[in-house]
């Protein structure tokens, strides 16, 4: 079974186990109807938890999960990730990509010369950031149009013409 990231638990709210979740999806409204998630530090250690109640406010999902009935249990989930089974995902929009599809892509710099490989997409408050391995070290590049000119799922590359500015 393949699991896909859909949210990140940020922190508890209140004393009864409610958690604040940052959606990592183009479909945050699905948090209102989903009955369960796989919860863990990675897909490999995720366990299923049923949703008792869900709401959306301020760009975040607020969830009560089965078995999480105290602030202490909710605090233990902070930093954990919420996954769904790939078979349950909405169809991808033509002009979009799933985050896991980007990992492992070649990164092309000026002159379309290969400069590295995308290791991970990091979710930051303002926008995503690409962690690129180049010359044996990590380079962080904001995933915004100003720096990322093209993403080709078919060609498996990301074009960052100004990559050298981040070295």
UniProtKB/Swiss-Prot annotation:
Residues forming coiled coils: none
Limits of the PRC barrel domain: 94-166
Pfam family, one: PRC_RimM
This protein's UniProt keywords: Chaperone, Cytoplasm, Ribosome biogenesis, rRNA processing
Keyword Transmembrane: no
GO molecular function term, any single one: ribosome binding
Disulfide-bonded cysteines: none
Localization terms from the record: Cytoplasm
Protein's job: An accessory protein needed during the final step in the assembly of 30S ribosomal subunit, possibly for assembly of the head region. Essential for efficient processing of 16S rRNA. May be needed both before and after RbfA during the maturation of 16S rRNA. It has affinity for free ribosomal 30S subunits but not for 70S ribosomes.
Assembly notes: Binds ribosomal protein uS19.
NCBIfam families referenced in this protein's UniProt entry, alphabetically: 16S_RimM
Record text about domains: The PRC barrel domain binds ribosomal protein uS19.
Protein name: Ribosome maturation factor RimM
Organism this protein belongs to: Chlorobium luteolum (strain DSM 273 / BCRC 81028 / 2530)
Gene that this sequence comes from: rimM
